[in-house]
Design a protein with these regions (language model features):
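Active-site rim elements
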Residues: 107-112, 213-217, 236-238
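Short, solvent-exposed loop/turn segments at secondary-structure junctions
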Residues: 60-62, 140-145, 159, 183-186, ...
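A structural signal for short, well-ordered beta-strand segments
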Residues: 138-140, 177-179, 249-253
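Non-heme Fe(II)/2-oxoglutarate
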Residues: 3-33, 226, 233-234, 238-327
């Protein structure tokens, strides 16, 4: 791997640039609880529902960690361009350091991970049941050693406007599972959240609205740790010392199905299925057209690009012409 991959620093526009390079500089020293999903799934879900995120411990075995890290090492060596290690780095590479956006398309050996037995039951609980969970995205990322400080702005991912006022709030519409593939200790780039911020339209509104409760919480953990977060919560990659690396697996899920009114006097629909997360993500034919009905349902959340690719018989040329089609 070349050693000249550098993050492009952002200007702090989400918070207060006079106070900090990221956010408002109110970085918490607290260590949030970590839950064993096998024994504490209900408690983990309750924590998420209250705060918009939860830390799950020991979600990947040593063998799984070795497999995924070997996969990353091998594909970086054999297909450097898909990670952003070639001469022409795409904007999404520059924002993330290194990212392999769509590894599922060509690597069925990753299929067992999309509904991982440690984290997926908690995901299903949060989205309203296993039959409500839809696949959205699976990617692998790395902040390379010596990449410097990126000063990524705090942001939320995909949101629905009704999140600001709806009652009840849950189930959420999208959530992401970040699995640490390397130890994330102080000094390393770290996933960082603003708890309880999913009801706010901007970080500045959250800062005012949460008052003394506003805090930016770094989530450190050993390799195998999983963090689930509501895509409406404000979060960032908190810079470390600019030298240490971090490697992660990110998987996004969407909520499927129509939600009925909670009122006993009506059965009208009140919330539609979550919309598609991106306009470019594609699903492998082997999964989208699986013989297994539950797998087909899980991979049924198609965007227009996916629909056009399927209509074209999953033609490789159609895929290659799409953004990130071969990345």
């Amino acid at each position: 791997m070349p050693m000249n991959v550098r993050l492009q620093p952002q200007v702090n526009i989400s918070g207060d640039a006079e106070r900090a390079a990221q956010g408002f500089g109110r970085v918490s020293r607290e260590t949030p609880p970590a839950f064993d999903p096998g024994r504490q799934g209900e408690a983990a879900a309750a924590f998420f529902e209250s705060h918009g995120y939860v830390v799950l411990s020991d979600c990947l075995s040593p063998g799984e960690l070795a497999f995924l890290n070997t996969f990353c090492d091998r594909t970086q060596a054999q297909m450097p361009e898909v990670w952003g290690l070639g001469e022409r780095r795409k904007p999404h590479h520059r924002n993330q350091g290194l990212i392999y956006s769509q590894p599922l398309l060509d690597h069925p050996e990753l299929d067992p991970y999309v509904r991982h037995p440690r984290s997926f039951p908690v995901v299903a609980r949060l989205l309203g049941g296993e039959e409500r969970v839809r696949f959205a995205e699976f990617n692998l990322r790395e902040t390379p050693q010596g990449a410097g400080a990126g000063a990524m702005n705090f942001h939320h991912d995909m949101v629905r406007e009704d999140r600001l006022t709806r009652t009840p709030y849950m189930p959420c519409d999208w959530l992401c599972a970040i699995h640490y593939l390397s130890d994330v200790i102080p000094g390393a780039p770290c996933f960082c959240v603003v708890p309880d911020s999913f009801r706010y339209a901007s970080l500045k509104e959250a800062y005012v609205g949460l008052g003394e409760g506003y805090r930016e919480v770094p989530l450190y953990g050993q390799a195998g740790t999983c963090i689930l977060y509501d895509t409406a919560i404000f979060h960032t990659r908190l810079d470390g010392d600019g030298d240490r690396m971090r490697r992660t697996w990110h998987q996004y899920y969407a909520r499927g199905g129509w939600l009925r009114s909670a009122l006993p006097t009506t059965d009208r629909y009140i919330r539609p299925p979550a919309s598609v997360l991106t306009d470019w993500n594609l699903f492998p034919e082997r999964l989208a057209r699986s013989d297994d009905a539950a797998t087909r349902l899980f991979f049924s959340h198609w965007n227009t690009a996916m629909g056009e690719w399927a209509a074209g018989g999953f033609d490789p040329a159609v895929r290659a012409a799409m953004p990130r089609g071969e990345q």
